[in-house]
């Protein structure tokens, strides 16, 4: 049981590329005895060396807590995302009821002028870094009710949006794809300073 080696040579970590010194053709600092000993010590023991920012971003993408701001029929599709067929929790995307414990807010449905201050208040209660997914045509730009006197024409007028999920209503697959895009965006950009 286990992996059988193809050859009898021991596994060795990749050599760091770093900044190459043109005169020697080796990375700068490669002849430093201190770092040479550390590299030799860690190379054969299976350690992975990375930056703290990359580690934090990796952990953040795998443990996003979301809260719903379900305002209309898109919320039904959002509920379907948590059911066994799609099971968004396998991607580390778990629901929370309190904005103080959540990282992501999903705005699903028609945002009215009377509801806009409540949306902003809930957004302000979320800890940094916080992300917002706008789900459906009504949340994205007013949708079917775009010309109504009481509808905000897109929740991006109230809170900054990170991911837009189009559709009326968007399917659970589309929302799941939006969640995966948000995780990719966090990995790529790190913490977003607002």
Swiss-Prot record:
The keyword Disulfide bond does not apply. Binds 1 [4Fe-4S] cluster. GO terms for cellular component: plasma membrane; respiratory chain complex I. It is found in: Cell inner membrane. It is a peripheral membrane protein. Its cofactor is [4Fe-4S] cluster. Pfam families: Oxidored_q6 (PF01058). It comes from the Bacteria. GO terms for molecular function: 4 iron, 4 sulfur cluster binding; iron ion binding; NADH dehydrogenase (ubiquinone) activity; NADH:ubiquinone reductase (non-electrogenic) activity; quinone binding. Keywords: 4Fe-4S, Cell inner membrane, Cell membrane, Iron, Iron-sulfur, Membrane, Metal-binding, NAD, Quinone, Translocase, Transport, Ubiquinone. Its EC number is 7.1.1.-. The keyword Membrane applies. It catalyses: a quinone + NADH + 5 H(+)(in) = a quinol + NAD(+) + 4 H(+)(out). [4Fe-4S] cluster binds at residues 73-74, 138, 168. Belongs to the complex I 20 kDa subunit family. NDH-1 shuttles electrons from NADH, via FMN and iron-sulfur (Fe-S) centers, to quinones in the respiratory chain. The immediate electron acceptor for the enzyme in this species is believed to be ubiquinone. Couples the redox reaction to proton translocation (for every two electrons transferred, four hydrogen ions are translocated across the cytoplasmic membrane), and thus conserves the redox energy in a proton gradient. NDH-1 is composed of 14 different subunits. Subunits NuoB, C, D, E, F, and G constitute the peripheral sector of the complex. This is NADH-quinone oxidoreductase subunit B 1. The lineage of its organism: Bacteria, Pseudomonadati, Pseudomonadota, Alphaproteobacteria, Hyphomicrobiales.
């Amino acid at each position: 049981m286990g992996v059988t080696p193809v050859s009898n040579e021991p596994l060795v970590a990749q050599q760091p590329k770093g900044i190459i010194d043109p005169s020697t053709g080796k990375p700068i600092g490669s002849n430093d005895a201190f770092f040479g000993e550390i590299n030799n010590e860690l190379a054969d023991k299976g350690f992975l060396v990375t930056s703290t920012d990359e580690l934090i971003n990796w952990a953040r993408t795998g443990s996003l807590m979301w809260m719903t701001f379900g305002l209309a029929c898109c919320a039904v599709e959002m509920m379907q995302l948590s059911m066994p067929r799609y099971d968004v929790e396998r991607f580390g995307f778990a629901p929370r009821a309190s904005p103080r414990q959540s990282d992501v807010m999903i705005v699903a449905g028609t945002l009215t002028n009377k509801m806009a201050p409540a949306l902003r208040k809930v957004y302000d209660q979320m800890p940094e870094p916080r992300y917002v997914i706008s789900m459906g045509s009504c949340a994205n730009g007013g949708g079917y009710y775009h010309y109504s006197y009481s509808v905000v024409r897109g929740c991006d007028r109230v809170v900054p949006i990170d991911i837009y999920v189009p559709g009326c209503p968007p399917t659970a697959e589309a929302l799941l794809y939006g969640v995966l895009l948000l995780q990719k965006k966090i990995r790529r950009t790190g913490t977003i300073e607002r």
